Amino acid sequence: MAPITGSNFHLHLVSDSTGETLITVSRAVVAQYANVTPVEHVYPLVRSQKQLDRVLAEIEEEPGIVLFTLLEKDLVERLEAKCQEINSPSLSIIGPVMQLFQAYLGAATIGRVGAQHTLNADYFRRIDALNYTMMHDDGQHVEGLEEADVVLVGVSRTSKTPTSIYLANRGIRTANVPLVPGIAIPRQLESLRTPLVVSLHAAPERLIQVRQNRLLSIGTRAGNDTYIDRQSVADEVTYARRLSAKHDWVQLDVTRRSIEETAAAIMKLFADRQRQRQPE
């Protein structure tokens, strides 16, 4: 198949489950290509020939790359045959990985659709973490901070809330507390013994940019607001760094990090800490 010209193309994601795996993998790959914008077509819960018929009709109407996570052999064969017929490249995202596992383990798969979404202990742990995190967002209910796995602190717009939610989705109970010059931090934060406290920092220039975008999004004129004043923001950052050093909190610069990268760094810190605390 000859490569397409231009920056836009159709990307068809066909799944017999939620489609989350396909979305995550495809977006990670697309991010490696500059000026490329796929038109995503997501087809979740495709589990019958009739459902697949509708998907194939749409793919034929707007051909492009087809990625899929289907376990039913008949569905896979039909999808691949149709893609070959219309000259659309197709690839099973989990097929090669399953083959590798099967060869190494010498065991067949259970073939259960959506097995990763089973209501097991991990699922309920994530739900519990999400409930806790939502209840302890932005300095709420500080009396329960000791029950957290991780407590994030930082000045405004250091991605505390989205990072907290991301961690909660990984089963990590996360609270976050804003650091504001002139306002004392909660006494509970100063006396924590169990949670990992991580202080998020960003360069003043980055904070100003994010804050300006925030003001624009809510239709507020900045004026001479200290919220985006260069010196005021620099003073905030200095205050947060000094306070973090005083309390020996882990400090993490998020200036050039995405939410996912920040969360990954925190998860590693948390895992390392858990291992250190385990008795030998």
UniProtKB/Swiss-Prot annotation:
Keywords, comma-separated and alphabetical: Kinase, Nucleotide-binding, Serine/threonine-protein kinase, Transferase
Pfam family, one: Kinase-PPPase
Assigned EC number: 2.7.11.32, 2.7.4.27
Disulfide bond sites: none
Residues the record lists as binding ADP: G154, V155, S156, R157, T158, S159, K160, T161
Catalytic activity: N(tele)-phospho-L-histidyl/L-threonyl-[pyruvate, phosphate dikinase] + ADP = N(tele)-phospho-L-histidyl/O-phospho-L-threonyl-[pyruvate, phosphate dikinase] + AMP + H(+); N(tele)-phospho-L-histidyl/O-phospho-L-threonyl-[pyruvate, phosphate dikinase] + phosphate + H(+) = N(tele)-phospho-L-histidyl/L-threonyl-[pyruvate, phosphate dikinase] + diphosphate
InterPro entries noted in UniProt: Kinase-pyrophosphorylase, PPDK_reg
Record bears the keyword Kinase: yes
Leader sequence residues: none
Enzyme class: transferase
Keyword Cell wall biogenesis/degradation part of the UniProt annotation: no
One term of GO molecular function: protein serine/threonine kinase activity
The family this protein is said to belong to: Belongs to the pyruvate, phosphate/water dikinase regulatory protein family. PDRP subfamily.
Reported function: Bifunctional serine/threonine kinase and phosphorylase involved in the regulation of the pyruvate, phosphate dikinase (PPDK) by catalyzing its phosphorylation/dephosphorylation.
Protein name: Putative pyruvate, phosphate dikinase regulatory protein
Organism: Nitrobacter hamburgensis (strain DSM 10229 / NCIMB 13809 / X14)
